Amino acid sequence: MQVSLETTSGLERRLTVGVPAEQVENEVENRLKQAARNVTIKGFRKGKVPLSVVKQRFGAGIRQEVVGDVINRSFYAAVQKENLKPAGQPSIQPKQLSAGQDLEYIAVFEVYPSVELSDLSVFEITRHKAEVTDVDVDNMIDVLRKHQATWTQVERAAADGDQVNINFVGTKDGVEFAGGKADNQNLILGSNSMIPGFEAGLVGLKSGDQKTLALTFPEDYHSEELKGAAVEFAVTVNSVSEAVLPELNKEFFQKFGVEKGGEKQFRKEVKANMERELGNALKAKVKGQVMDALVASHTVDVPKALVANEIQVLRNQMLQRFGGQQQNFDVKSLLPDTMFQEEASRRVTLGLIVGEIVKSAKLKPDAKRIKSMIEEIASTYQEPQEVIDYYNSNQELLAGVESAVLEDQVVDHILSKAKVSDVDSTYDDVIKSKAQR
């Protein structure tokens, strides 16, 4: 086999491969003989079909299969010979495929870049410390009660936290705009469900009151037509209702899966869930800083093929989130590559950097941490042991956990080198900052 390598630009390589005709013809001959033993043709007994007949009927197809197999095998043999690591599938350009002549083709592909790690000791990371207090638990229970609240109509002015039923019509320059009209719409004042100023403008109104609100849409509003636009909403209040919170009793606790132990057990489980959420948020906060520092401190030439693959992954994830059926619309038109380009490039960049850290630090997934992570995932289900068994028997899920654990180990490795400052914080501050990321 003859191989010549050319660096065309950046990460792109051009490999010219030549395979002796004898090798190809021998393999074609062997495939024809194998087909002759197995093929059934009318007028001949199975296994007794003349080779000339098989060649006439199936020769072209068999040759095509052999050429494909030879190209595939010879390509990977060639990249091993040249110590190359292809990133993505090659583009194959045939040069010579004629029978009886050496097979020759050109493979164009990208290779993985070399990543030179920066000095991890200069990273400055802020590690927040927080605990779940009794006050935090009280506040969370209040939130849970509000989620289970019932509403009773009242004959008084609306206040923050009340639910109003309204009709409204929005206009821009005196003309109604799309999506700006609704009848019998329930709205909790203070929920920030509407644009700034809308809910505050209804505080103090009673059933039957009418009011025109002069407001401005935010500059970052999703509709291009309404970004930063001055509008008016003509609002009619149909009714005002106040929340009636449920009592902390057995019926309430059962709604959250607490059958025994009363309020003490309920508080215990609420606190455990909050601690789990807080722990994950604290971990994510540190991890986010570490990953940002890695991206900022490294310049990596990312293979276009890997970015394209990651774009497709992100597009599929978005489709799954919104329940989109690909056959019903032009996916690439609705969700173009440009929508995911930046995030995909970042993910590929991080993957390459993290991979190099794993290699240089000789990190391997820690079995105890894998077990612990699976148990933590399982603890949120009604039958934890079934979930644990399912993860341990599913190689794809297990690989996902191993990857997550290895990434956590990379973060720990970086923290052991970096300048880390501990800062006291609160449950609310940590959880709010997580929601804003």
Curated annotation (Swiss-Prot):
Its EC number is 5.2.1.8. Pfam families: FKBP_C, Trigger_C, Trigger_N. InterPro entries: PPIase_dom_sf, PPIase_FKBP_dom, Trig_fac, Trigger_fac_C, Trigger_fac_C_sf, Trigger_fac_ribosome-bd_bac, Trigger_fac_ribosome-bd_sf, Trigger_fact/SurA_dom_sf. Residues 161-246 form the PPIase FKBP-type domain. It comes from the Bacteria. GO terms for biological process: 'de novo' cotranslational protein folding; cell division; chaperone-mediated protein folding; protein transport; protein unfolding. GO terms for molecular function: peptidyl-prolyl cis-trans isomerase activity; protein folding chaperone; ribosome binding. It is found in: Cytoplasm. Keywords: Cell cycle, Cell division, Chaperone, Cytoplasm, Isomerase, Rotamase. One of its GO terms (cellular component) is cytoplasm. Its main location: cytoplasm. It catalyses: [protein]-peptidylproline (omega=180) = [protein]-peptidylproline (omega=0). Belongs to the FKBP-type PPIase family. Tig subfamily. Consists of 3 domains; the N-terminus binds the ribosome, the middle domain has PPIase activity, while the C-terminus has intrinsic chaperone activity on its own. Involved in protein export. Acts as a chaperone by maintaining the newly synthesized protein in an open conformation. Functions as a peptidyl-prolyl cis-trans isomerase. This is Trigger factor. The lineage of its organism: Bacteria, Pseudomonadati, Pseudomonadota, Gammaproteobacteria, Cellvibrionales.
